[in-house]
């Protein structure tokens, strides 16, 4: 599939399935804990500065945000998880919204699960990966902020993440930096393969 990634726009924000776009376009969901770099990932992948709002305040994305890419596919940004300053009730509401989307959306082709290369995956990261494996949803692990770690230590950090996740070697694992754009081509290859 040929994609003009510059031709991208935020389409709509949805709280439940009655608000989802009603068409057949394939979707790739982006999941990860708050401040893992999802907005930076979207902006880098689409060669845009501010298409997805980056925020110093974790937990800003509270709806499913659908991004139209060249009228051929969509990214769906789901609320960041694991942010403590959101009420338990609010977190449960997000959880139900995310679960409904991931388990019922026929357009969904795969989930890009973002983890921070600098840190061991959180319990939420592990739970998300196990959830995706349980529902047999194709998953691409993208380890963000690779530029914050010397290249010589990438393998060590990658191994630690894979071990904690009990990583399935048949899944894609991509080291990514929104600063240097390392991993961008590999991420697009993995995504397009799932469509």
Curated annotation (Swiss-Prot):
Q: GO biological process: any one? A: division septum assembly
One GO MF term attached to the UniProt entry:
GTP binding
- The EngB-type G domain, residue ranges: 24-195
Q: Which parts of the sequence bind Mg(2+)?
A: 39, 61
Question: Which PROSITE patterns does the annotation name?
Answer: G_ENGB
Q: What keywords were assigned to this record?
A: Cell cycle, Cell division, GTP-binding, Magnesium, Metal-binding, Nucleotide-binding, Septation
Determine if Cell wall biogenesis/degradation is one of this entry's keywords. no
Q: Where is GTP bound in this sequence?
A: 32-39, 59-63, 77-80, 144-147, 176-178
* Cofactor(s) annotated in UniProt: Mg(2+)
Can you supply one Gene Ontology CC term for this chain's record? cytosol
Q: Which Pfam families match?
A: MMR_HSR1 (PF01926)
Q: What does this protein do?
A: Necessary for normal cell division and for the maintenance of normal septation.
The entry sums up its family as follows: Belongs to the TRAFAC class TrmE-Era-EngA-EngB-Septin-like GTPase superfamily. EngB GTPase family.
Q: What HAMAP family does this protein map onto?
A: GTPase_EngB
| Stored PANTHER family | ENGB-TYPE G DOMAIN-CONTAINING PROTEIN (PTHR11649:SF13), MSS1/TRME-RELATED GTP-BINDING PROTEIN (PTHR11649)
Protein name according to UniProt:
Probable GTP-binding protein EngB
């Amino acid at each position: 599939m040929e994609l003009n990634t510059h031709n991208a726009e935020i389409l709509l924000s949805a709280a439940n399935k009655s608000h989802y776009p009603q068409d057949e376009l394939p979707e790739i969901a982006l999941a990860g804990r708050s401040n893992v770099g999802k907005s930076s990932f979207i902006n880098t992948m689409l060669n845009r500065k501010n298409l997805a709002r980056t925020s110093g305040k974790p937990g800003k994305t509270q709806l499913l945000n659908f991004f139209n890419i060249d009228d051929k596919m969509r990214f769906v940004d789901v609320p960041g998880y694991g942010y403590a300053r959101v009420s338990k009730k609010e977190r449960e509401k997000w959880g139900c919204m995310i679960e409904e989307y991931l388990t019922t959306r026929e357009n969904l082709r795969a989930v890009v699960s973002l983890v921070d290369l600098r840190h061991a995956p959180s319990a939420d990261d592990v739970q998300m990966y196990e959830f995706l494996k349980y529902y047999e949803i194709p998953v691409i692990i993208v380890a963000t902020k690779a530029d914050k770690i010397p290249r010589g230590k990438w393998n060590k950090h990658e191994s630690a993440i894979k071990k904690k996740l009990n990583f399935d070697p048949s899944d894609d694992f991509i080291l990514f930096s929104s600063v240097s754009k390392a991993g961008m081509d590999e991420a697009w290859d993995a995504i397009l393969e799932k469509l």
